[in-house]
Design a protein with these regions (language model features):
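Extended redox/cofactor-interaction regions of prokaryotic respiratory oxidoreductases
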Residues: 2-5, 169-243, 247-252, 278, ...
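N-terminal export/assembly segments and adjacent metallocofactor-ligating motifs
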Residues: 2-296, 300-375, 389, 406-407, ...
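Short, glycine-/Ser/Thr-/acidic-enriched flexible segments
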Residues: 64, 77-78, 84-87, 101-102, ...
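Flexible glycine/proline-rich, aromatic-decorated loop/lid segments
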Residues: 260, 556-589
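Long, contiguous, secondary-structure-rich segments that constitute the structural scaffold
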Residues: 603-647, 734-736, 740-752, 756-840
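Glycine-rich phosphate/diphosphate-binding loops that line cofactor/substrate pockets in enzymes
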Residues: 136-155, 213-221, 399, 420-432, ...
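N-terminal leader/propeptide and maturation segments of large enzyme subunits in energy/redox metabolism
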Residues: 118-134, 292-416, 593-679, 723, ...
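Short beta-alpha connecting loops at secondary-structure transitions
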Residues: 265-271, 586-596
Length: 840
């Protein structure tokens, strides 16, 4: 097949290699930088030539770091990117290979130069060049026709995490356009199972996945790392893990795979993929049975003493005894009330006023309001006014009693004695638990997170230096609650999770009403690469759309399957503001260093142009500077810092906090009760599209098998290998795939497999092999690795389809998801592997 046209991209593999070789001539634009120069010392603020200028940039993909970088410009061209030196915060001075490679990304030979219209079949790679005016006219005409025929909701925008900034995360101008045409929105459904499991216990006020500042891990006595390969997935946080090791922190890695992170830890525990919740529940059982709980913390800062009615699972309140409903409850001293946090997803309600919760106070032998109790009972079974009750802690203890270490050992393949050892370490504080994105990538993914935050609750290991439990520290985000997008009203059309689109479109219904989706504008996302079950997604969703527009800088898998492709400006070709990241707690100003290349336009200008063609230009008179100023004025953090667009543009980088942040310091939680709610009174789905959920299952952390990747699954006999993902330091969620110097270092999509499994299938080390199941296949290069657990395959995620000999990872991944988390389950898939014998 060598030299033939690739249906995915319209560019042959041979043609791509020629283009890459030809692109070397363009290296003069970036100072002839070679791979060897990556290792050189790059001094901040020091131009290499007298005529060079240095601009402040922020590297802002969804790696989560938002590193400040210097953008060196010579004769109107970016010639180098280097680490910004922030003297007051040397620990955040970082840059990685991706950050260093920005000039190659900007001047990528594959960069889209002008608008393209499809002239062949979708995916054929046949395009024609058109003008921006033609493109905008076509979009306006198609959208008007579709909305007139099918309704306003039939046009939708899809965006996910293609960048972090006001324009690249909040998408204010696109959203205003969508609001004005009353269009639908589509969400990406990625990495939210951890959030559901964690935040329904602690609340959402500290941000998503909340944990202590990464610099705090050095203060832990025991550091647990769960399904997180920091050395590759969180490059900039890795140094803090190393600091902890050097300081003598006892580090334990729980991961099916022997990762680089695991190799540096004091202890590595290989757990069966998808069984993390069973392991953690067993650890809770040991902690309870051995009396290792922090009783005072349980009484004062958790729902442990709350009495749960056996009749309906809700908490016993004063109104249950007085016969007075919540709405009729007097707000006097005798029945003190509290407001449910308006943003709390546990309840799905807004500022409800509830009757006071009651507990059994052993000090006086009576029911009292929880805040008045002196010694509330955390264990016990009671009956009041004919209502049987148990404490929330009793219900937890009963649930975990099913998972003795011996029983859990059968499920998770971890020795019972090891489970006991881990449990005891969890009570020996300070203890930090850091969760990665592995255990949440299964249908049962919320429950490992829910169980782990429950361990922190029952041991009191949260809210002080060295003691935390979470997946990431996003508290430095400035929170752009913009008023710009909804200024003229919000769209009444629905927000749809991408995972539910096949079901919605196939049924033709949403919320019990007829529903049609016929056009999609996709920006800051690449669903045909980064989503799952790509063949079904194409068949049931994309092939049913009458018009697909993709805004991007290169021909992604999704762009290749669209009708119109619009070239967008790169990050250093326009101004933007970022609110900080996991290891960068600065609000940063990204200066415009160069003009947009070729005919590319900024996202704002693209949205404005479409609006003009739709007769809506009068609603888009604000400049980008005014939009950024609006974002800062609506940010509580920026207001506290006294920041405006003008002041930040002058300062460039402004710290949002001093010192090391401690999540939930002083045991302050933003749940309805103000406590850690390991028992969830009112579980709700993270993204509601009218689905049913199992409320009882979600009240407590539980174990149930993954949707597919489990030995007892009916598909296991046919496909006996669990497919697990690993992140690469050379790409970020599908970005940087075409950057030629990084492809020199990482040229081919690969998968790792235990040699015993590979040899049993006749697959040779270094050979191309086919990974397959009933959904599809992909052909990637095999790497033998003893670090991979037998019965597993580990793939490097989000490679563009054109780099495979055939297929792609997105073809073999399962669409099944939990209706509570509505989260992509990237590891919940079974496959098999066989040699690939076809020609290149």
């Amino acid at each position: 097949m060598s030299g033939s046209e690739n249906a995915h991209s319209g560019l042959t593999r041979r043609g791509f290699l020629k283009a890459t070789a030809a692109g070397t001539a363009a290296s003069a634009l970036i100072g002839g930088v070679s791979l060897g120069a990556f290792a050189s010392e790059l001094r901040s603020g020091q131009p290499e030539n007298a005529g060079d200028s240095i601009y402040q940039g922020i590297c802002r993909p969804n790696c989560g770091q938002c590193c400040a970088i210097d953008v060196h410009v010579r004769d109107g061209k970016v010639v180098k990117t280097a680490m910004t030196h922030i003297p007051d915060s040397p620990e955040v001075n970082r840059i990685c290979l991706r950050g260093l490679s920005h000039p190659y990304r900007i001047y990528d030979p594959e960069r889209i130069k002008y608008p393209l219209r499809r002239v062949g079949e979708r995916g054929s790679g046949e395009w024609e060049r058109i003008s921006w005016d033609e493109a905008a006219e076509e979009i306006a005409q198609k959208w008007a026709e579709i909305q007139e025929k099918y309704g306003s909701q039939a046009v939708a925008q899809y965006a996910i995490s293609g960048g972090y900034g006001v324009f690249t995360t909040n998408h204010p101008v696109y959203l205003r356009l969508n609001n004005l045409i009353n269009g639908s929105k589509i969400t990406g459904c990625v990495d939210m199972a951890n959030a559901v499991g964690i935040n329904r216990v602690v609340g959402w006020g500290e941000g998503v996945w909340s944990t202590n500042d990464a610099r705090d891990v050095v203060n832990a006595k025991n550091l647990f790392i769960w399904a997180d390969n920091w050395s590759e997935a969180q490059i900039q946080e890795w140094r803090f893990f190393c600091d902890a090791i050097e300081s003598g922190v006892n580090t334990i890695v729980i991961d099916p795979v022997y990762t680089i992170t695991a190799s540096k830890a004091n202890k590595w525990v290989s757990v069966r993929p998808g069984s993390d919740a069973a392991l953690i529940l067993s650890m809770i059982d040991v902690i309870i049975s051995e009396g290792l709980t922090d009783v005072t913390f349980l009484q004062e800062h958790t729902v442990a003493p709350f009495l749960v009615k056996s009749t309906d699972g809700s908490f016993l309140r004063q109104s249950d005894l007085s016969g007075t409903s919540t709405a009729e409850t007097d707000k006097g001293d005798e029945l003190r009330t509290f407001d449910v946090h308006a943003a709390n997803r546990n309840t799905g309600t807004s500022a409800e006023v509830e009757s006071p919760i009651l507990v059994w106070d052993e000090a006086c032998g009576a029911l009292v309001e929880v805040e008045k109790a002196v010694n509330p009972a955390i264990e016990g079974e009671f009956e009041f006014n004919g209502i049987p009750c148990k404490t929330a802690f009793t219900l937890l203890a009963e649930e975990v009693a099913q998972y003795s270490p011996e029983k859990a050992a059968e499920i998770c393949d971890v020795p019972a004695d090891t489970i006991r050892e881990l449990a005891r370490l969890c009570a020996d504080g300070p203890v930090t638990h850091r969760m990665g994105w592995g255990s949440q990538s299964y249908v049962n993914g919320a429950h490992p997170a829910h169980a782990l935050i429950t361990i922190a609750a029952i041991t009191g290991q949260i809210g002080y230096p060295g003691a935390s439990c979470g997946a990431a520290d996003w508290s430095a985000s400035s929170g752009w609650a913009q008023s710009y997008a909804p200024k003229y009203g919000a769209s009444s059309s629905p927000t749809l999770p991408v995972l539910a689109l096949p079901e919605i479109i196939e049924s033709g219904e949403y919320g019990g009403e007829p529903f049609a989706l016929k056009a999609m504008l996709i920006h800051h996302g690449n669903p045909l690469c980064t989503s799952v079950d790509m063949n079904r997604l194409k068949r049931t969703v994309f092939d049913q759309l009458e018009h697909i527009v993709v805004v991007d800088s290169v021909m992604t898998d999704t762009a290749c399957y669209s009708d119109l492709v619009l070239p967008v400006a790169q990050w250093f070709e326009f101004e933007d503001i970022t609110g900080g990241g996991q290891t960068n707690f600065y609000t940063g100003f990204n200066e415009k260093a160069i003009e947009p290349l070729h005919e590319s336009k900024t996202d704002s200008d693209i949205a404005r142009l479409i609006a003009e063609k739709m007769g809506l230009g009068e609603y888009f008179t604000e400049t980008d500077a005014e939009i950024l100023d609006d974002a800062m004025l609506s940010s509580e953090t920026c207001q506290k810092l006294g920041l405006s667009y003008a002041s930040l543009k002058e300062s460039k980088l402004v710290p949002q906090r001093t010192g090391v942040k401690i999540a939930f310091e002083g045991a302050k939680f933003t749940t309805p009760s103000g406590r850690m709610e390991f028992y969830v009174e009112k579980p709700v789905a993270f993204s509601n599209y009218g689905q049913d959920i199992d409320v009882e299952r979600e009240r407590l952390p539980r174990f149930f098998p993954p949707g597919e990747a489990w030995p007892e699954n009916e598909k296991y006999e046919k496909y006996p290998l669990t497919l697990m993902t690993s992140r690469t330091k050379y790409q970020v969620h599908g970005q940087w795939f075409s950057v030629r110097n990084l492809r020199e270092l990482d040229p081919d999509p690969t998968f790792r497999i235990n040699p015993a499994d590979a040899r049993a299938r006749g697959v040779e080390d270094g050979a191309w092999a086919e990974i397959f199941n009933d959904r599809g296949h992909c052909v990637a290069k095999c790497i033998y690795s003893e670090a991979v657990r037998p019965g597993s395959v580990v793939y490097m995620k989000n490679w563009a389809a054109k780099y495979f000999k055939a297929g792609s990872w997105a073809e073999v991944l399962s669409l099944e998801f939990d209706p509570v988390t509505v989260n992509h389950c990237f590891m919940d898939a079974l496959v098999d592997v066989r040699p690939w014998s076809q020609e290149d």
